[in-house]
Design a protein with these regions (language model features):
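Conserved N-terminal subdomain of the carbohydrate kinase-like
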Residues: 2-6, 12, 21, 29-159, ...
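Short, glycine-rich nucleotide/cofactor-binding loops
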Residues: 24, 49-58, 166-167, 356-368
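Short, flexible loop segments at boundaries between secondary-structure elements
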Residues: 53-56, 184-198, 460-472
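Histidine-anchored nucleotide/phosphate-binding helix
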Residues: 57-71, 177, 365-380
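Short internal beta-strands
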Residues: 76-81, 187-191, 208, 383-387, ...
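Conserved phosphate/ATP/ADP-binding segment of small-molecule kinases
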Residues: 166-261
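Conserved post-catalytic alpha-helical subdomain immediately downstream of the catalytic base
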Residues: 241, 267-326
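Nucleotidyltransferase catalytic core that binds NTPs
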Residues: 320, 328-472
Length: 472
């Protein structure tokens, strides 16, 4: 079976509107403690994390919910949380993000799941888990099932995100799948269950990882042959469900039958963090499947999204246009970001100063390269902000020689440049206000000229450095 052609992939992606997708699963709270390590504790041979900031996000099935919202889907969330402070925080986040909480039930005998990660730079130092007791099963699910029965007719897909925390009783899963089947709604399952997959019978898709598929089939998945064997056994157990088997470093296997399968490889890029990759796969699959895309096209985009996810520390949700640009322009586009994305990214970084320069960067030449090559002397995180095509047209009265994405890609290919962003305004004032750089770099001629953004530079307390090679 051949990989889908690029034009078909793009057409399917661009045809997606805002499908209604219901996510049923184990809702958790992810807490991140970000800091720096500068010494070893005198009490024990362990690093001392100096706390810089903390952040709380939706985790587990909640991560799928946030992925789908960021992708532009209309998302309905359902699950079980405890009547505790962690559960209340989940409800607060859902409300702030604009979700209806009517499908989320709070119960007194369940401790809401918390995953507390402690991180220095790109290194996870420790994860502290707050889990329910082993073997916990929530039995009083009749009200939740009634709610699911009432809401499913308005949905275009159902995602079951089962982290095996006891909130999804096997009978609840079976009944919900039966209701969805009666309505011809595709059901996509992300299982953490290492045992009985019979409870998922009737699902349209299932997305196990290597470990989960191995445990469910008794096969040690070492290569493509054993992966195909395991996928075939799973499909028999699940009455013909499509298998999207995540093979970590080896990519993704799409298995429709023993004659119809594709291995999607991974790009040879640096992996920072695998957390959230599986959730990204099920999110993109559900969006495209609910929109009528073919299995091969849906899996192709899902694997691309996972490749983007593992290049970030912590869980990241991507907008649809970000993933599209990665497809069109390749992996160099990971350096090309929106202002919103860059703000989020900088909030999670260490205390390295932000160093920024801006300009048209049209008609790129060796003098530009010399100028940009010297940005590293400031020992910070370097950002190049470029005027959009429309901005240049307004300011110069003519379009640039190179369009904005060509300019951005060329700049992103330079080792001295960490990120590139394109701004629509006529000046860089808003970018400076949002990013609050420590250093603004200009060409030498600006030592004797008025800098357009000088007032903002003064407001944010940045210093201006001048480089001699080129004036922007």
């Amino acid at each position: 079976m051949l990989n889908p052609d690029p034009q078909s992939c793009l057409s399917a992606w661009d045809e997606v509107t805002s499908p209604n997708i219901l996510v049923l699963g184990d809702l958790m709270l992810d807490r991140y403690s970000w800091g720096t390590v500068e010494r070893i504790s005198p009490e024990a041979p362990i690093p001392v994390l100096r706390l810089v900031r903390e952040e709380e996000r939706l985790g587990g099935a909640g991560n799928v919910v946030m992925n789908l919202k960021t992708l532009g889907c209309k998302v309905t969330v359902s699950g079980l949380i405890g009547k505790d402070s962690i559960g209340n925080q989940i409800l607060d986040i859902l409300s702030k993000e604009g979700f209806d909480n009517s499908g989320v039930q709070q119960v007194s005998d369940y401790p809401t799941v918390l995953k507390h990660r402690m991180i220095a730079g790109h290194n996870h130092l420790l994860r502290l888990d707050h889990d329910p007791p082993a073997g916990y099963q929530y039995l009083n699910y009749s009200n939740l099932l009634s709610w699911l029965d009432s809401i499913l007719p308005s949905q275009q897909a159902l995602v079951i995100s089962d982290y095996n925390k006891g909130t999804l009783h096997p009978s609840l899963i079976k009944s919900t799948i039966q209701i969805a089947n009666s309505l011809d709604i595709p059901v996509l399952v992300d299982p953490r269950n290492l045992g009985d997959y019979e409870i998922y019978k009737g699902c349209s898709w299932i997305k196990p990882n290597r470990k989960e598929a191995g445990a469910a089939t008794g096969i040690s998945i070492r290569d493509q042959e054993t992966a195909l064997k395991a996928a075939g056994i799973l499909q028999q157990k699940l009455n013909g469900a499509i298998i999207a088997l995540s093979l970590d470093k080896d990519g993704l296997l799409l298995f429709q039958s023993s004659e119809e399968f594709i291995f999607f490889g991974t790009e040879a890029l640096e992996v920072f963090d695998v957390v959230g990759a599986g959730d990204m796969v099920i999110s993109i699959l559900s969006m495209l499947v609910s929109s009528g895309a073919t299995p091969s096209i849906a899996a192709h985009w899902a694997q691309l999204g996972a490749a983007m996810e593992i290049q970030h520390v912590g869980v990241v949700s991507f907008e649809r246009e970000e993933i599209r640009k990665r497809f069109v322009y390749g992996h160099t586009s990971t350096k090309i970001v929106s202002l919103k994305r860059l703000q989020q990214e900088l909030a999670l970084k260490d205390e390295s100063p932000v160093v920024i320069t801006n300009g048209y960067f049209d008609k790129l030449s060796s003098t530009h390269l010399k100028f940009l090559g010297q940005l590293r002397k400031f020992k910070g995180f370097t950002v190049v902000a470029i005027n959009s095509d429309a901005s240049i047209q307004r300011k110069k009265g003519e379009p640039p020689l190179l369009d904005e994405m060509e300019r951005a890609r060329l700049l992103a290919s330079l080792q001295s440049v960490d990120r590139v962003l394109i701004f629509e305004e006529d000046n860089c004032c808003e970018v400076f206000r949002c990013l609050k750089p420590k250093i603004v770099v200009k060409g030498a001629r600006y030592q004797h000229r008025q800098i357009e953004e000088s007032q903002v530079i003064e407001e944010i307390g940045a210093c201006v450095e001048f480089l001699p090679e080129y004036s922007l």
